């Protein structure tokens, strides 16, 4: 099984590292091309394009100008330890063992607007470039056009390497749009997480993001390799609901949190 997740806007380049192992991103030539486009933007243009404050735009203009592709542990950090949003709060990679990192390196991929597809231990320098950004480029009007089939091709290679054809989609819709399901040489399974609110079960964004991280951790720490094992997921009160589930959509429910 290969898991895909979204990246995070919040980054952490300060905390102690849980592993010294690292790898290099496989699509850095593409990242370099995007960086060169982004370096042409003024902070005001970045603010408008990304819908962020002037202060954040200034920070990201500086990141674009400082980015250089000779990544080392001194100037970059492993992606799984650099991202710090809700998904990564659920995953808690800082508590992984070396065996967990090894399993994750084979079975987990992070989608990225700048890096395309990252393995957990791939070094990355800080950036902000969400997949939905309408950044004009030689291939079209946005990043979906820029990446085209390339991310899907990388996923197919990863599926082949890890020995089966099951892709677990734990990414957001914005990021999964960068994958072409018709061109995937595998079958998709999408876990869905419903939380109770006032007696009704629905997707609550904050909880759902964290649950995607919890599911990733459950698969990695238990070294799961078969989709039927996913129904045992029970972290933080979630339970599988067979009645609401289908072959390619597994539904997990949780009682209201107090």
From Swiss-Prot:
Pfam family, one: H2O2_YaaD
GO cellular component, one term: cytosol
Gene Ontology biological-process entries: response to hydroperoxide
Domain of life: Bacteria
Signal sequence extent: none
InterPro entries: YaaA (IPR005583)
Coiled coil start-end: none
HAMAP family tied to this protein: UPF0246
Family: Belongs to the UPF0246 family.
UniProt xrefs under PANTHER family: PEROXIDE STRESS RESISTANCE PROTEIN YAAA, PEROXIDE STRESS RESPONSE PROTEIN YAAA
Protein name (database record): UPF0246 protein YPO0462/y3714/YP_3720
Species whose genome carries this gene: Yersinia pestis
